[in-house]
């Protein structure tokens, strides 16, 4: 018998002792796909270079890593953070992706967009199509880099950027790129260090992306996993963002734990047989009680007798 289990977004205040000095933030439970806590989670603003998360996943899903492209005059429009590739250089999609995500190369963003979309404008359409597919209803992308000096930039919220990052983390190649601390170009012409310093400073950090423009200020997404508790934090305009992320993770990991509701396999529940294709996991506060009710082949899960998801 098939059991329908789908996750709903909820808002709960769980970890609240770390002071936040910024515009908006979210702590997002990647496993259960809900909001642990946050502030101004639906506030819409330019998100700067964390936009490149969407750029990366669109490229990964629509191109081959080993494809070589010839750099053309498209990069003449690049400014700000760049890895300084040159016209007529031949470079792989793989190298461009690492330059995009580790060094936030705006030149990489433009060349990837041109290669995958045929034009930068068509690639931006692909970014917005993917946003709709993921359920990012407020988000709108104007370019593949996150620059916002010539227009309002790429607009999103901490909640929707967390949703995007969670989606991307289902892709093994994306995870491999964002957790890489140092990368040597395949052609040997460059050696790049990841700007996400939490990868070196915090052992449970497994990826993320930095961002900054004068308009957006600092933007940061990180992900950390400890004892299978999988959290994503997004901050906008937070001056001490790396410190805040690390302290918030430690606070949440102290109060949070993974619970296995049902192991993978065939299970008899109150006289009916159900097949669980994977372990059914959820995260909860350590002093929380969790219960469930099965009705019409749907499972309703309760925390402290409060319905949270089905």
What are these model-derived regions, one by one?
Residues 3-13:
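Sec-dependent N-terminal signal peptides
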Residues 88, 264, 284-285, 290:
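Glycine-centered loop/turn motifs
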Residues 1-3, 310:
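N-terminal secretion targeting segments of exported proteins
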Residues 294-296:
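Cysteine-rich modules of extracellular adhesion/ECM and protease-associated proteins
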Residues 35-37, 291, 308:
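Generic structural signal for well-ordered beta-strand positions
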Residues 14-172:
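Active-site-adjacent loops and short helices of periplasmic peptidoglycan-processing enzymes
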Residues 145-147, 289-292:
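Short linear loop/turn motifs
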